[in-house]
Amino acid sequence: MKIGVIAIQGAVSEHIDALRRALKERGMSAEVVAVKHKGVIPECGGIVIPGGESTTLCRLLAREGIAEEIKDASARGVPILGTCAGLIVLSKEGDEQVEKTSQELLGIMDTKVNRNAFGRQRDSFEAELEVEILDSPFTGVFIRAPGIVSCGPEVRVLSRLDDLIIAAEQGNVLALAFHPELTEDLRIHQYFLDKIFKNA
């Protein structure tokens, strides 16, 4: 089985490394691949959309033909993890900033996002988070992070910070405003792997 990490921009190598370590710890076997072009996603049993700059990410996903492949994979129930800008890309609706830049969001999650909910790049910070799927706090690394301001009834809220939703799940899709790949804590990647292998 392949797990594809969208490798257009963002913390790509960190996600690949975290997934490989999580696979090893779980005693699972899968090939983690960097996805740069159309044609790889249909072979993947799991997809990661890393952080980066959401406007550029949306444009490149559409241009490379990867956006439609991700939508098709999601419709088939393939587990998808989006972190930071990945959370924005997965959403159905953005704020005025997103509308202004004409970003073509994937619309896979029934969520509305505030693109820079936690400020600009200089406003990076860490916070101890209670995340519903974990049995103890998780250190969230936030870098110019977005936040979910509202969501539909099918969305399960997993964590909040400052009245904003920062982790949510809708069926096969998991979206985080923070960067689990920038910590040594593999629990979220392991949770995602469990979703992938249950779906396989």
From Swiss-Prot:
Question: Which residues take part in binding L-glutamine?
Answer: 52-54, 115, 143-144
Matching Pfam families, A to Z?
A: SNO
Pathway(s) per entry? Cofactor biosynthesis; pyridoxal 5'-phosphate biosynthesis
Q: Name one GO cellular component term.
A: glutaminase complex
Q: Which organism is it from?
A: Methanosarcina barkeri (strain Fusaro / DSM 804)
How does this protein assemble? In the presence of PdxS, forms a dodecamer of heterodimers. Only shows activity in the heterodimer.
Keyword Hydrolase belongs to the record: yes
Tell me its EC number(s), please: 4.3.3.6, 3.5.1.2
- The protein depicted here goes by the name Pyridoxal 5'-phosphate synthase subunit PdxT
| UniProt record similarity statement | Belongs to the glutaminase PdxT/SNO family.
Active site residues of this protein: 84 (nucleophile), 179 (charge relay system), 181 (charge relay system)
Q: Which GO terms describe its molecular function?
A: glutaminase activity; pyridoxal 5'-phosphate synthase (glutamine hydrolysing) activity
Protein purpose: Catalyzes the hydrolysis of glutamine to glutamate and ammonia as part of the biosynthesis of pyridoxal 5'-phosphate. The resulting ammonia molecule is channeled to the active site of PdxS.
Gene Ontology BP, a term: pyridoxine metabolic process
Gene symbol? pdxT
Q: Which CDD domains match?
A: GATase1_PB
Q: Does the keyword Electron transport apply?
A: no
Its UniProt entry gives the catalysed reaction(s) as: aldehydo-D-ribose 5-phosphate + D-glyceraldehyde 3-phosphate + L-glutamine = pyridoxal 5'-phosphate + L-glutamate + phosphate + 3 H2O + H(+); L-glutamine + H2O = L-glutamate + NH4(+)
Q: Which UniProt keywords apply?
A: Glutamine amidotransferase, Hydrolase, Lyase, Pyridoxal phosphate
Stored InterPro entries: Class_I_gatase-like, PdxT/SNO, PdxT/SNO_CS
